[in-house]
Regions:
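Kelch-like beta-propeller repeat domains
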Residues: 1-345
Length: 345
């Protein structure tokens, strides 16, 4: 089932409008959100300037649908488009970008007696933003995104049990560069789908729908099934979200429409005209999708407007999956948080 949550931090009128690409996770039984970006004043279609946020908020998690938020600190700088990984010790925030530059910073946020602590971890050897990541055992993997400002298919790994070793470059994911892919760990393997890349010197724009599974033992990628809807149409999860679900499954939601967004990347759709259509025109993915690793098959849980987001973040805890903010169409955010509840056997 899917239910709307109530309550969003009100301390900053810009942030209150909802953001994309925030840092988020579960920390000591609380949902933590931080950073993110939006166009709070003038819409992007009218040349508005993107604002980035710095505040960190927490709200206790319960079965209740109401959040009570409190500000608990600030990020080192206003940022968005990084990766947040929940660990036993706290939340690890990796990379991202500010209004002016991409980041290589990595740090651990932890709660000690209601006080937020920040511990510096080894920095990435490159700057990374708009990437994805997941934890397999004590290996933290970060894949795709912009690496030193260029769309990439690179992957880096940090062994959390041996921080002195720093980040290591792992096997690139096959195919085109993948900005804003979806990455989920399940049963000791890493799964990645989707992603796109604007044109850069020597490379034309691309959009990927395919997926791969990475085995840490062999350090090799193998192809897995492309997501598709009930009619059999392939779905782009680029800009979407994914999380482990139920008994060994993976839940994916959101993402841009593969045909429309590729035309935007190619410049066929551009400027104010492209940005001024109604929400429905952009056809963000409405399907809640379940991937079954054992059979390499996809099923759909149905179509939900609440899942049709790009740049939303999904956070999971005890059979609840929170879809946080994101955009309804390019430049237009929502401050909604919706919760998917697993059916318990």
């Amino acid at each position: 089932s899917l239910e709307k949550m109530h309550g969003f931090p009100t301390g900053n009128t810009g942030f209150l409008k909802g953001v994309s690409a925030l840092y988020a996770g579960v920390i000591e039984g609380n949902l933590l959100i931080a950073g993110g970006c939006n166009f709070p004043d003038i819409p992007v279609a009218d040349g508005g300037k993107k604002a980035y946020y710095r505040d960190i908020y927490i709200a206790p998690l319960s079965n209740d649908t109401a959040f009570e938020w409190k500000k608990i600190g600030q990020l080192p700088q206003a940022a968005a488009y990084g990766v947040t990984i929940s660990t036993e010790k706290g939340l690890i925030c990796v990379g991202g970008t500010t209004a002016t530059h991409s980041l290589s910073d990595v740090f651990l946020l932890s709660l000690q007696k209601d006080t937020l602590k920040r511990e510096t971890l080894p920095s990435l050897p490159v700057t990374m933003d708009n990437m994805a990541g997941a934890l397999v055992g004590h290996s933290l993997y970060i894949v795709g995104g912009n690496v030193n400002g260029i769309p990439s298919s690179a992957m880096y790994m940090l062994d959390l049990s041996d921080l002195s070793g720093g980040w290591k470059r792992e096997t690139d994911i096959p195919g085109e560069p993948r900005v804003q892919p979806v990455c989920v760990a399940q049963d000791g393997k890493l799964y990645v789908w989707g992603g796109f890349a604007p044109a850069v010197e020597g490379h034309q724009a691309s959009l990927s729908v395919d997926g791969y599974m990475y085995s840490p033992e062999t350090k090799e990628w193998s192809s897995v099934a492309t997501p598709y809807d009930a009619e059999g149409n392939e779905i782009s999860l680029g800009g979407g979200m994914g999380t482990s679900f139920g008994e060994g499954m993976i839940l994916c939601a959101g993402g841009v429409d593969k045909d429309i967004f590729l035309k935007a990347l190619q410049g066929i759709y551009a400027g104010k005209e492209y940005l001024s259509h109604p929400v429905e025109w952009y056809r963000f993915n409405r399907n809640l999708l379940l991937y079954h690793p054992q059979t390499d098959k996809w099923t759909t849980l149905g179509e939900y407007e609440q899942g049709a987001r790009a740049g939303a973040v999904i956070v999971s805890q005890d059979g609840f999956h929170y879809i946080i903010n994101g955009e309804l169409k390019p430049g237009i955010r929502t401050n909604e948080i919706n919760r998917i509840k697993e059916k318990r056997r």
